[in-house]
């Protein structure tokens, strides 16, 4: 109890920081309810064919990609809490609208609107936390991610119970629960204060040209290169959603029940270790330095996947478990690194627009990731070795471009920061 109380008391951002954690929990519970059954809802309740469901999901996902840069750009011009509240209301209305029709094109339109709101809200929540937590943003990200994962798990468990019932009414109640969660989040957001204007805490007070016209991230080649490299580093997500389940399904030795157990292991590890690991990337310099061990962990994960195909049932299970642990550690380290560097590389005057463009990395990975892991599976053990090695090399590449992007802050701030802390 004392440790739990201390953990909760020391959340950066004060009362608004606590409120945003409740928002993350409620949001992810709702998302967990719907994400687990969305395809089944469209199949069994709306009576769509497999091809129609696939097209609907693909189109809504493609439209959602625009949400991140659009939301970030708007947030640089309007009060952040108002934009966030409006987006949550939009998500709630989109979910309710799905309940009102079985028309294919209307379902596609409502799903696309919900996807757009979802991606925009994700980026703006990150921007809010960045402005609110200031120099403690990495720790806040870790706490927020821990709470969000717990929310996903709770939502998934509730959805599993409804799936056991398997009726159309059960699916509708889950969708309604998703809508209610967004409405509750909108209400909670109205109670949050507007955070101070974004200031990049890695730079000193002698920033150059702070009042210049905001830069466009689309003309910033260095930042776009960073975003492209981060897209590759997000591929660990595809390992758990597609790679491990398919690899296990096609293995002659791995027990098929291992896949969900490894997903549980991933979730438990993130909840248990994300906050402790965050302290290793609490500054921009430390986050950049983490790219070196992150490179090794990605390579280790790919190697473990490859070796899992060379032995019997025990060897396969052990190495697949080892691969899951390695990719989970990589996921946690990369979450810390990505949060800090994406903010540190963004100019103060256009922080929202830049973080919106960075949000494209995760969106793009959702399309590229499944293709990358299925290619690795098709190539066999060598494919997994190449998969891990490619991400490892990308980590080293990112380590270099970050150094070149922030030459002055990286050289001047550590001396000040070390002496002050």
Q: What are the residue ranges of the model-derived segments?
A:
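C-terminal membrane-cytosol helix-exit motif in multi-pass small-molecule transporters
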Residues: 160, 180-201, 397-401
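Conserved MFS/SLC helix-loop-helix module at the cytosolic interface between two early adjacent transmembrane helices
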Residues: 65-101
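Helix-loop boundary and gating motifs at the non-cytosolic
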Residues: 6-61, 222-266
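Helix-to-loop junctions at the C-terminal end of transmembrane segments
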Residues: 66-79, 163, 272-288
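Juxtamembrane intracellular "pre-TM" segments in multi-pass secondary transporters
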Residues: 1-18, 192-232, 415-421
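Transmembrane alpha-helix termini and helix-breaking/packing motifs in multi-pass membrane transporters
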Residues: 44, 154-173, 250, 368-387
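Structural signature of the two symmetry-related core transmembrane helices
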Residues: 82-96, 289-305
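Cytoplasmic helix-loop-helix junction between adjacent transmembrane helices
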Residues: 110-148
